[in-house]
Each structure stands twice: as structure tokens, then as C-alpha cells.
A protein has these predicted regions:
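N-terminal active-site wall of soluble small-molecule enzyme domains
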Residues: 1-24, 38, 60
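Glycine-rich tight-turn/loop motif centered on a GG-T
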Residues: 3-5, 22-27, 62-76, 108-113, ...
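Hydrophobic faces of well-ordered beta-strands that scaffold small-molecule active sites
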Residues: 4-10, 26-30, 48-52, 95-102, ...
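Gly/Ser/Thr-enriched, mixed-charge loops and adjacent short helices
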Residues: 87-107
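Conserved anion-binding
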Residues: 24-25, 32-94
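C-terminal active-site-proximal or functional interface alpha/beta core segments in diverse enzymes
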Residues: 104-198
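Active-site-proximal loop/turn and secondary-structure-junction residues that shape catalytic pockets
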Residues: 12-14, 32-34, 52-56, 78, ...
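Amphipathic, non-transmembrane alpha-helical secondary structure
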Residues: 15, 19, 23, 33-41, ...
């Protein structure tokens, strides 16, 4: 894999990380708007995404892995997203994406539609204000699995349907071009793929 097949995210990027990312043509996904000036010191990414904190998050495995919401330390908070994309556009970047992390180990199918709606409201307003479009939207992960016998598994079909319904409605509401939708299944694929033997 290389180039735009790779989305490069990181919290603590070194100058070398940035230079190698620019040289290889990967998609830069910035976790903090303050990283943009550092990246621009070395060059201009062809495609830029920000990790948007939708202002709400949930975790079924403890509050320290909530990943989104008012107290989360990751992602661009809702009130700073417009300024982040405005700065990127002003710097001459023309191709954009958006990313979020909705939470961790969520097994409530309707939650994914809800959190997608929050993200779409934020970036829909950004797109309309700045007259930019989003080539892709990475809805992150958070797809949960049961860890105890009494826990119900995630209904993945219902989660997909809820997400698609909300996404279509918001695209129409904000007059957005349909983006490529992506997810990061992570734990959902590998979390129950083996046994821990002690």
C-alpha cells in the first residue's frame, strides 16, 4: 500500500514523520488543528483530513477509552472545526476528508446513526460555509463485541442501516456530494478471534 491508500494519523508527529508522509503522498489525518502549521512548514498534503470530535462519545469498556466528547483529549472540538478547515483551504489545500472516533466497544446499533448525524452536521456546515466538499468520511471504529455471556452482540446490519439512513438525510440537507464512507472494524473483526490461556 502507498499514497492515498494510506491514511496517516498521529498524535505526536516528528518532523521526520511529516516529511516522510509528504514524500509518500499519504492522506494526512490531523488529530489537532495546531498540527497544520507544522505540516505546512514542510509542504502541502494533497489530501487533508481532520479527526473531528463530534462533541459526544460513549464507551462500554470504561470512560478512559471514550475517544470523543467534551472531555476527550483527541480530535478537533466542534467549535474549532470550521477554523481548522478554513486554515487548510487558505493554505491552498483543495482536497478534503473528515474522520471521527465515535467511541469504544459500542453494541447499541442506533448509536452509530446518532453519532454519524453529529459529525455530518459539523462538516455539512463547514462544507457549506467554505464551499468545500469531502471526498471521504471515515466514521472510525467503536464497533463492539460482547465480553460476557449476558451481553448482546452488536447487530451490524442495523448499525449499517441506521448510519446509511442518517448519512443520506444529512447529505441532502447540506447539499453535499456523496463521499466515500469508511469504517475501522478493529476489535469487531479480531476481538473474539482467539482465546487467552493463563
Amino acid at each position: 500500500l502507498g499514497g492515498e491508500d494510506v491514511m496517516f494519523s498521529g498524535n505526536f508527529l516528528s518532523d521526520d514523520d511529516i516529511q516522510q508522509g509528504l514524500a509518500s503522498g499519504v492522506i494526512f489525518n490531523l488529530d489537532d488543528e495546531a498540527l497544520l502549521p507544522r505540516v505546512l512548514r514542510f509542504g502541502k498534503p494533497e489530501v487533508l483530513s481532520f479527526r473531528v470530535n463530534p462533541g459526544y462519545g460513549r464507551s462500554n469498556v470504561g470512560e478512559f477509552v471514550t475517544n470523543a466528547g467534551p472531555r476527550a483529549k483527541f480530535g478537533v472540538h466542534p467549535d474549532k472545526v470550521l477554523a481548522a478547515y478554513r486554515a487548510a483551504k487558505k493554505a491552498g489545500i483543495r482536497r478534503f476528508g473528515a474522520h471521527m472516533m465515535p467511541g469504544s466497544c459500542i453494541t447499541d446499533a442506533e448509536y452509530f446513526g446518532f453519532i454519524t448525524g453529529l459529525l455530518m452536521d459539523i462538516i455539512g456546515k463547514v462544507g457549506r460555509e467554505l464551499k468545500i466538499s469531502f471526498e471521504f468520511i471515515d466514521l472510525g471504529g467503536g464497533l463492539g463485541i460482547p465480553y460476557r455471556d449476558e451481553e448482546q452482540p452488536l447487530d451490524i446490519e442495523a448499525a449499517a442501516a441506521s448510519t446509511a439512513t442518517v448519512c443520506k438525510r444529512k447529505l441532502k440537507q447540506y447539499g453535499m456530494k456523496p463521499p466515500r464512507l469508511m469504517m475501522e472494524p478493529a476489535r469487531y473483526f479480531v476481538g473474539d478471534a482467539g482465546y487467552l490461556v493463563g
